[in-house]
Regions:
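N-terminal secretory signal peptides that target proteins for export/translocation
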Residues: 1-8
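Extracytoplasmic metal-acquisition and chelation regions
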Residues: 29-310
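Bacterial N-terminal signal peptides
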Residues: 11-24
Length: 310
């Protein structure tokens, strides 16, 4: 009798395990396959899609924003994607178009419903009067680092919700519900960050790559110069000499760099005494920045602490 009961128990256990496994497989199969170019975009997509989406980011957050190293795994991911979310403004122009061509997925080609451009509706800063890559400028359509302004993050969330609903209209009410909740959370956090960032108002800084314009505009900081001559153009010796002289005259307390080499920041700091801070212009670069909200929070707190505000 005990053996019979034991065998029945194992059969029941096995049946339940199979059913649970099948349910998980079905759930995964039904999930919308989302590929984002950057971790911040991926996180916002997860907040909008919740359990309905399976989201992966191509970049990790520590790469040069305009030159993500291509990995073989990118192609099959793009080939299977239902939607692709990009920064836009040609941020990914140096590496993504070739990948899309090889991946050969018409659903996510530029201009198609599955291609979601996060920059739509963003108030673009530093937009040039004409489109020109002749001198290697990596911001030919304006500064693409808009996610450093959390108000722009709200616009991105709306774009992602609209893009998901465009491709999967049957789930539009769910996307809208999640969007509403996420925007409310962002509004609350933005109010907190603006209070927290009061010590940053009027603070001068130098950056390596021109990527902090949106953050500075939101929180009242003043950029006085960049190590790069133009976005993506490394400095000449004469440019460094002039920048060092400017720092000595204007005395900005901070030099911010991210994915770039520390060589020039350390060289400038040795000559001027300026404090060097490494902050990545996308979430995911540190464990504390694995969500969009955590990334902005970490960035605000780090800079406030750097100027002695906390």
């Amino acid at each position: 009798m005990n053996t019979l009961l034991h065998n029945k128990a194992w059969r029941v256990f096995f049946l339940v395990a199979v059913l649970v496994g099948l349910r998980s497989d079905l759930l995964f199969a039904q999930q919308i396959r989302v590929i984002a170019t950057w971790p911040a975009l991926a996180d916002i997509a997860r907040q909008i899609g919740k359990d309905m989406v399976n989201v992966e980011s191509l970049a990790t957050g520590v790469e040069n924003a305009h030159g993500v190293p291509i990995r073989p795994s990118f192609v099959p991911k793009l080939n299977r994607a239902d939607v692709l979310i990009v920064i836009g403004l040609d941020n990914e122009a140096s590496w993504l178009p070739a990948l899309l061509e090889v991946a050969s997925n018409p659903r996510i080609a530029p201009g198609q419903p599955g291609y979601i451009d996060g920059s739509i509706g963003v108030s673009v800063l530093e937009a040039p009067t004409r489109f020109d890559r002749a001198e290697g400028d990596l911001h030919p359509k304006g500064n693409s680092h808009y996610l450093l302004d959390p108000v722009s993050g709200k616009i991105v969330a709306q774009n992602i919700a609209a893009g998901l609903a465009r491709n999967f209209p049957q789930y539009q009410p769910t996307f809208q519900k999640n969007l509403t909740a996420y925007l409310a959370e962002l509004d609350s956090r933005i109010a907190q960050w603006e209070k927290m960032a009061v010590p940053l108002r009027g603070v001068k800084f130098v950056e390596y790559h021109p990527e902090w314009a949106y953050f500075a505009n939101r929180f009242g900081m003043k950029r006085i110069g960049s190590i790069e001559i133009k976005p993506g153009i490394e400095p000449t010796p004469n440019h460094i000499v002039n920048l060092v002289q400017q720092i000595k005259q204007e005395k900005p307390p901070l030099l911010i760099y991210g994915a770039q080499s520390p060589r020039f920041p350390e060289q400038i700091a040795a000559q001027t005494g300026i404090k060097v801070i490494r902050l990545y212009s996308s979430g995911g670069g540190r464990p504390e920045t694995d969500s969009y909200i955590k990334w902005i929070d970490y960035t605000v707190r780090t800079l406030v602490q750097a100027v002695g505000g906390v």
